[in-house]
A protein has these predicted regions:
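Solvent-exposed coil/turn segments that connect beta secondary-structure elements
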Residues: 52, 70-72, 87-89, 106, ...
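N-terminal beta-strand/beta-hairpin edge segment
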Residues: 40-143
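Hydrophobic membrane-targeting and insertion signals
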Residues: 1-61, 66-76, 219, 225, ...
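Short secondary-structure junctions
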Residues: 37-45, 149-154, 205-210
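Extracytoplasmic/luminal low-complexity segments enriched in Pro/Gly and acidic/polar residues
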Residues: 186-235
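Short glycine-rich, low-complexity/disordered patches
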Residues: 45-48, 154-165
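Small-residue helix/turn framework positions
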Residues: 95-150, 163-165, 170-205
């Protein structure tokens, strides 16, 4: 009888250890497979799944999924590195509550398809409308403005940015002032007057999952704040 009881205790302890320690590892492997099935590709990808208590994972609920990877591509988003945490996840319905983290070396597409470099993107908020704070160099945006002006209008110009959102466009030695503005998720160069047309620098849609809502020009960096639907991106 005593031997039987000891065996039951040992069996219970084994099951407990499997549920408490091994279950998150197993679910992590399944989550990695689901991530890859969604179109995610990356190098050295690590997915850590946790729930409190761990047996809650058997119901399909995870408190947190932490994803790190490099050389990432997923749908229209490309990044040199990703460090993102998903919270309050229903793995059965693939619904995500909130998102937080950082993307570095991000590339999106300009309206003409050319790549646009974003140094860093910080994510925070609801998975369906995550606030994305993007940091770009002023030099990158000036080059982007010049290339899009040339592509969209045929006008060769020099573009200089100045805080908080001012622009000077010089064509054949003549300068025209303007502003960087946002409208319907796009970043626009809007010249004052009617001499030059409005030029779209970044627009949501093919090649760009971000919707821009505000822009601020600093001394060396430009900050874009907008939203991204991480839920759609990962499912």
């Amino acid at each position: 009888m005593r031997s039987c009881l000891i065996q039951l205790v040992l069996l219970f302890a084994l099951v407990f250890c499997l549920l408490w320690f091994a279950l998150p590892l197993g679910v992590g492997a399944l989550a990695t497979g689901a991530l890859n099935a969604s179109g995610f590709s990356g190098t050295d990808t690590k997915v850590e799944v946790s729930a409190s208590p761990p047996p809650m994972l058997l119901t399909g609920h995870a408190d947190k999924i932490h994803i790190t990877s490099s050389q990432v591509s997923i749908s229209d988003l490309h990044a040199a590195s990703v460090d993102v945490t998903l919270r309050d996840i229903d793995m059965l319905s693939r619904k995500i509550g909130t998102v937080g983290g950082t993307l570095e070396g991000v590339r999106v597409a300009a309206p003409n398809g050319d790549p646009v470099a974003i140094d860093e993107v910080t994510l925070d908020g609801s998975a369906t409308a995550t606030t994305a704070t993007c940091r770009m160099s002023v030099a990158t945006v000036q080059t982007l403005a010049q290339s899009q002006l040339k592509t969209q209008t045929g006008i060769a110009a020099k573009v200089v940015l100045k805080g908080p959102n001012l622009v000077t466009v010089t064509v054949n030695g003549k300068s025209q002032s303007g502003r960087l503005l946002t409208s319907n998720g796009s970043l626009l160069l809007v010249p004052n007057g009617n001499t030059l047309p409005t030029v779209t620098l970044i627009a949501p849609g093919a090649g760009n999952p971000f919707r821009v809502t505000s822009v601020t020009i600093g001394l060396a960096d430009l900050t874009l704040v907008g939203t991204i639907n991480v839920q759609d991106l990962l499912t």
